[in-house]
């Protein structure tokens, strides 16, 4: 994943998915938050390492320039890059529950954590309020 420097006149607002959800991006103010592309290297993405992958990062940058930003755009500086492990399960539905009094979990986002985290958070808050 990465987030760019502010991009003047960023033309979109919202959360978007591409390639069956393997790519996801959204604006954060006038910055671009982009992640995914793990389907481009399944073998090496099955890891617990938190290191970024050069192949995935390059694939994301290429996607940004070819598919998201207008043709001829100056490439924005990437301000921060990171990666993480994904919680997968046989059922593609998050687990949202109270484990014991005042201990809640929201896990197994099946690779869609960035995209669905706001909705999951709302459900956890609702569960906490009873």
Feature map (PLM): residue ranges:
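Flexible loop/turn segments at secondary-structure boundaries
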Residues: 11, 24, 41-43, 88, ...
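Flavin-dependent oxidoreductases
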Residues: 1-32
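Amphipathic alpha-helix from the class-I
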Residues: 37-47
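Flavin-binding catalytic cores
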Residues: 8-9, 46-83
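Short conserved micro-motifs at the rims of enzyme active sites and ligand-binding pockets
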Residues: 13-15, 45-47, 117-118
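Short, glycine-/Ser/Thr-/acidic-enriched flexible segments
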Residues: 7-9, 39-40, 101, 110-112
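Active-site proximal loops enriched in glycine and acidic residues that flank catalytic Cys/His/Asp
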Residues: 6, 27, 36, 82, ...
């Amino acid at each position: 994943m990465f987030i760019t420097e502010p991009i003047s006149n960023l033309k979109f607002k919202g959360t978007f998915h591409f390639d069956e959800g393997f790519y996801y991006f959204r604006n954060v103010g006038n910055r671009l938050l982009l992640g995914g592309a793990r389907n481009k290297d399944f073998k090496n993405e099955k890891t617990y390492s938190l290191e970024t992958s050069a192949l995935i990062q390059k694939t994301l940058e290429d996607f940004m320039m070819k598919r998201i930003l207008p043709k001829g755009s100056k490439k924005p500086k990437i301000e921060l890059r990171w990666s993480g492990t994904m919680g997968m399960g046989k059922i593609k539905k998050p687990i949202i529950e109270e484990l014991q009094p005042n201990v809640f979990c929201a896990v197994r986002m099946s690779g869609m954590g960035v995209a669905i985290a706001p909705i999951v958070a709302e459900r956890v808050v609702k569960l906490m309020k009873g």
